Swiss-Prot record:
Pathway: Carbohydrate biosynthesis; gluconeogenesis; Carbohydrate degradation; glycolysis; D-glyceraldehyde 3-phosphate from glycerone phosphate: step 1/1. The gene is tpiA. GO terms for cellular component: cytosol. It comes from the Bacteria. It catalyses: D-glyceraldehyde 3-phosphate = dihydroxyacetone phosphate. Its EC number is 5.3.1.1. It is found in: Cytoplasm. Pfam families: TIM. Belongs to the triosephosphate isomerase family. GO terms for molecular function: triose-phosphate isomerase activity. This is Triosephosphate isomerase. GO terms for biological process: gluconeogenesis; glyceraldehyde-3-phosphate biosynthetic process; glycerol catabolic process; glycolytic process. Substrate binds at N10, W11, K12, G178, S218, G239, G240. It comes from Rhodococcus jostii (strain RHA1).
Amino acid sequence: MARKPLIAGNWKMNLNHLEAIALVQKIAFSLPAKYFDKVDVTVIPPFTDIRSVQTLVEGDKLLLTYGAQDVSAHDSGAYTGEISGSMLAKLGCTFVVVGHSERRTLHCEDNDTVLAKTKAALKNGITPIVCIGEGLDVREAGEHVSYNVEQLRGSLAGLSGEDIAKVVIAYEPVWAIGTGRVASAANAQEVCAAIRATLGELASQDVASGVRVLYGGSVNAKNVGEIVGQTDVDGALVGGASLKADEFATLSAIAAGGPLP
């Protein structure tokens, strides 16, 4: 099954709403409509920017989409500081990142929490980008494949094949995030192939063949082509490079198969 590449730009805690508007405008200007037949492009801004991005995307009928960096496991209630899936859906979010390594590490989110957030996203018609990945100690011990498979199983435990078909998986080796280090294309393929095989076990081969698996970890215009060219890598979850309109547009164009913008 042909899988359309996805390039997702995770802005993390950067840019105010005015800066967000300027960046989205620059990205859209750099990517003519022809590219969107071959690649899906989404931006993942902070919560405070989403309404401004929504107004711009809908008002100018832009072809790129947008999403959120996190979602509450709860529908509503006394959960100070949390944002529900229904709120994000009302803002038109297509995607939401769940289980990012920074959430798992800094906010102590475990697989059960990631699973609950994944369910919350699906309940509200939002595509969860479920993140998994190993630290350097696991990689050096040669246990990276089994570690990621276990994390994947825990993060999707009990989901139906129908629900699994609606998720995106992002493999983000923690040791390569924001460090400038990057897994080789072969490294990325090894883990992404194991992810797809596990999806086949959790759901079916048909479902697994349709799920997009992204690579995230110091992705840039120089390495994205080789990485997304791997059989089981269907795009990238981009960090720092997504804050630079020209580079993010170039990444997207490369994933689309060119030509460069």
